[in-house]
Amino acid sequence: EMFLERGLIFPHEAVREWEAQLAPLLSEALRKHRRGRIGCSWYVDETFIKVKGRLIYLYRAIDRDGNLVDVLLSEKRGKAAAEAFFRSARTVTGCVPERVTSDGHTAYPGAIKAVLGEEVRHRINRYLNNHLEQDHRGIKQRIRPMGGFKSVESAKRFCRVHDEVRNFLRPRSYRN
């Protein structure tokens, strides 16, 4: 509407191309901004989204205060995917957590030991991860009206940018 008032008309394809070019740049800038600002207690979980009618796994982690740690989309749900996620999270945050809380996914204990080290305490409890499960709702509610994705690349781009922007704009309560 702002552009129409000024006499500028863009085809839908141009807007989609801008998104494809600018979304990764925005995502990387926000990831760099987050480095070193993450707590030492992580909550990790995975959920699934539809891509071309198939289920693809979205690994997500937040810290104790609800700040985003990392997001990774994987076609498989196993130890290799969990290790890739923890490597990515360690690279993004620049630190190793003291404690990781997860549900009962069997790939997490081995991946945590292999990537983060033996000294990281791993808690397995379905109910302690509840605020992360609730956090999945934000991305699921955004994806549901779209009916899934047509390509894995667009799903990766969307999931990463959506969570990064949502984390950057969310209201925070600081402890005094």
Where is each model-derived feature located?
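Residue-level recognition of single "structural anchor" positions
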Residues: E1-N176
